[in-house]
Swiss-Prot record:
<keyword id="KW-0808">Transferase</keyword>
<feature type="transmembrane region" description="Helical">
    <location>
        <begin position="279"/>
        <end position="299"/>
    </location>
</feature>
<comment type="similarity">
    <text>Belongs to the glycosyltransferase 4 family. MraY subfamily.</text>
</comment>
<feature type="transmembrane region" description="Helical">
    <location>
        <begin position="328"/>
        <end position="348"/>
    </location>
</feature>
<feature type="transmembrane region" description="Helical">
    <location>
        <begin position="17"/>
        <end position="37"/>
    </location>
</feature>
<keyword id="KW-0961">Cell wall biogenesis/degradation</keyword>
<feature type="transmembrane region" description="Helical">
    <location>
        <begin position="254"/>
        <end position="274"/>
    </location>
</feature>
<feature type="transmembrane region" description="Helical">
    <location>
        <begin position="190"/>
        <end position="210"/>
    </location>
</feature>
<dbReference type="InterPro" id="IPR003524">
    <property type="entry name" value="PNAcMuramoyl-5peptid_Trfase"/>
</dbReference>
<comment type="pathway">
    <text>Cell wall biogenesis; peptidoglycan biosynthesis.</text>
</comment>
<dbReference type="GO" id="GO:0051301">
    <property type="term" value="P:cell division"/>
</dbReference>
<keyword id="KW-0479">Metal-binding</keyword>
<keyword id="KW-0133">Cell shape</keyword>
<dbReference type="GO" id="GO:0009252">
    <property type="term" value="P:peptidoglycan biosynthetic process"/>
</dbReference>
<keyword id="KW-0472">Membrane</keyword>
<feature type="transmembrane region" description="Helical">
    <location>
        <begin position="230"/>
        <end position="250"/>
    </location>
</feature>
<keyword id="KW-0131">Cell cycle</keyword>
Amino acid sequence: MFCFLGLRLLKYITFRTAYATIFAFLLALIFGPFIISRLKKLKLDQILRKDGPKRHLSEKMGIPTMGGVLIFFCVLVSLFFWIHFFNIYFLIVLFVMVSFACLGFTDDLLKIKRKNSDGLNPKFKIYGQILFSFISVVMLYYFGGEHVSILYFPFFKSLKLDLGILYIPFGMFVLISASNSFNLTDGLDGLAIGLSIVVIGALIIIAYLTSRVDFALYLNIPNVKGCEELVIFLGALLGGSFGFLWFNAYPAKIMMGDTGSLSIGAVLGMVALILKSEILFAILAGVFVVETLSVIIQVVVYKKTKKRVFKMAPLHHHFEELGWSEMQVVIRFWIIGLIFAILALSTIKIR
């Protein structure tokens, strides 16, 4: 790591974050074409839902999947140079990223092998998510700081709730929900990664404020000692995500796959847990929450009445069926995601 060079600039979180971001972005631009060509040669193409929008079957055939590999490669290489590895919060987030990426990779691989969109057995998939989330939340519970089991509520200065040992199942719920909601949203070129970039950017701000005693006291938010390394991690993830978006923007040359979406969702959920922003995260990731609710509502109502609330779920497909172009859906969802992020950040001061 560059820290051994003793350069004064490397003591500054902002400097390391900026260069971790730039480094990961440039790595994605450099290695992106190579990884895309390798995935094509290996015939690791995206398997499309047969019950999805019909035009997707012709437009998106033959596009390689497992794009999460590109993101995480760039993130890890960048972090090698810019982060202090032996930080407990970074190690927990790293475990979440790798474990959920492996689960998603297995799911993607089985879809390709079987040539259908079923992938990993849903029971095994949820068991894997439960196992990995349990391990990571237990690690956080026992090695985290003094605030670890306390929930802080936006808008209220002194409203707190100490969950005690119940924080473990609560944390597992946050991780699994975040992982699956990001996965459900990954249905259009640039949609999930663009919304993820908005969430990552907001979490960078929250992580920086939370890491500083002075800002934490002024804003009446918990000061989480040691979380400054998460700012650098999120910076690298932001750079890698921007680099991936370069190739995933319409018309996409690569898809994120479950390798990316399951892992990014879980990672951001874990970061929210560490930063004591669990409730805030629900606002921040508002588009992902709405997308998930649209699927739940569609399934529940259809089972009871045999009628559909939406033309198609998740919600982004509903708007496609209404005649919106893919780019219209994506850009409008990005705008709404940005509004949710601004709303979430504004609550930090309104207490």
